[in-house]
Amino acid sequence: MSYTPGIGGDPAQLAQRISSNIQKITQCSAEIQRTLNQLGTPQDTPELRQQLQQEQQYTNQLAKETDKYIKEFGFLPTTPSEQRQRKIQKDRLVAEFTTALTNFQKVQRQAAEREKEFVARVRASSRVSGGFPEDSSKEKNFVSWESQTQPQVQVQDEEITEDDLRLIHERESSIRQLEADIMDINEIFKDLGMMIHEQGDVIDSIEANVESAEVHVQQANQQLSRAANYQRKSRKTLCIIILILVVGIVIIFFIVWGLKG
């Protein structure tokens, strides 16, 4: 499995890459769920658990990459006329990404629970008491012990073996990695929430500026219209005055000419 590194800032390509990654995350989550369903069955092997870990880490990397792409998409330059359409597109991608992440985190939690149950069984069968280190407080936030509500595994009278120790260490390492990855997904959820809030503020500011500019243009047009009307009235008044003066001069001319005659 592999994931694609960063791409250019073309909006169409970036949106396509985000959609493609979201689809991959959804498909990988379904594949992880199918693998989880095989645990505890005759198909459960170390190779299967290794495959599960690889699928989970690959999907986690896809989620981080998609988070980065969505951030880039939100800050691409755009014109005011394109801004609303860009926001609608981004909101749709964020909603789809959130749904895919929610499903992925669900199977992550299931995987962590299965690993803990496995370690608990190995410890019980090997007469090893206790759970996990006291400082592993993060695990308590994500993993619930189903064994607390189920009958305890019968303890067998045998000492712990090197194979048991190796299995316990491997599974504990896998649990720590799973819970670190779950924390990564939680951080992505926080990023998505912040991006939605910031994007909304930017859109509101741009729309307010556009509306303000439209008001100023309308006011300027009104002022120009009033000035044009005033100019037309002034010209009309001037023409009337000139006409009156001409008529007056003609009348005076005839009066003077009549007196001379």
From Swiss-Prot:
Spans through the membrane: 239-259
Phosphothreonine modified-residue sites: T4, T79
Residues covered by the t-SNARE coiled-coil homology domain: 165-227
Principal subcellular localization: membrane
Gene3D superfamilies per the UniProt record, alphabetical: 1.20.5.110, 1.20.58.70
Modified residues (Phosphoserine): S125, S126, S129, S205
Modified residues (N-acetylserine): S2
UniProt record, GO biological process: endosome to lysosome transport; intracellular protein transport; organelle assembly; organelle localization; positive regulation of receptor localization to synapse; positive regulation of T cell mediated cytotoxicity; regulation of protein localization to plasma membrane; synaptic vesicle exocytosis
Region (Disordered): 128-148
Gene Ontology molecular function: chloride channel inhibitor activity; protein-containing complex binding; SNAP receptor activity; SNARE binding; syntaxin binding
Coiled coil: 47-68
Family: Belongs to the syntaxin family.
Assembly description: Interacts with VPS11, VPS16 and VPS18. Interacts with VPS33A. Forms a SNARE complex with VTI1B, STX8 and VAMP8 which functions in the homotypic fusion of late endosomes. Component of the SNARE complex composed of STX7, STX8, VAMP7 and VTI1B that is required for heterotypic fusion of late endosomes with lysosomes. Interacts with TPC1.
Record-given protein name: Syntaxin-7
Protein source organism: Rattus norvegicus (Rat)
